């Protein structure tokens, strides 16, 4: 099964920007850790990062038929983008929202997610480990989907 990892605006600046909030780890290093988990658990994984809302919407839509689940950190678009929310709802893939920082310890405007209501779950505040937790959760979702498929009567 395949996981599509979508990273939103400014996540390409991890390791440089606001290290007191996001930590020193670069996005490439987070992706390496996620790839290691995927390889160890028989999952395929693809990474995408964009600072542009429309490109993120396009990638979510392209995931339909190409991926089995999405892990997304929409960055600031989390709090503003109805378009990203609608794209997630449209593809109907299990989606996990991820944030490095605990958004509930930050500014009030960061405490409202437009996309959380259409996601399977939200993981926030564990730094880079948030992505590992998302991979564990997605792997569990995939196992549950496979178990349900195995229980379905075979079509003749």
Swiss-Prot record:
Gene3D superfamilies listed in its UniProt record: Dehydroquinase, class II
Any one GO MF annotation of this record: 3-dehydroquinate dehydratase activity
Keyword Amino-acid biosynthesis: yes
Biological processes annotated in GO: amino acid biosynthetic process; aromatic amino acid family biosynthetic process; chorismate biosynthetic process; quinate catabolic process
Keyword Lyase appears in the UniProt entry: yes
Catalytic residues of the enzyme: 22, 99
Binding, substrate: 73, 79, 86, 100-101, 110
InterPro entries attached to this UniProt entry: DHquinase_II, DHquinase_II_CS, DHquinase_II_sf
Keyword terms, alphabetized: Amino-acid biosynthesis, Aromatic amino acid biosynthesis, Lyase
EC number(s) per entry: 4.2.1.10
UniProt xrefs under CDD domains: DHQase_II
Site (Transition state stabilizer): 17
Pathway: Metabolic intermediate biosynthesis; chorismate biosynthesis; chorismate from D-erythrose 4-phosphate and phosphoenolpyruvate: step 3/7
Signal peptide: none
Pfam families cross-referenced by the UniProt entry: DHquinase_II (PF01220)
Catalytic activity: 3-dehydroquinate = 3-dehydroshikimate + H2O
Description of how the protein assembles with itself and partners: Homododecamer.
Record function comment: Catalyzes a trans-dehydration via an enolate intermediate.
Family: Belongs to the type-II 3-dehydroquinase family.
Record-linked HAMAP family: AroQ
Protein name: 3-dehydroquinate dehydratase
Underlying gene: aroQ
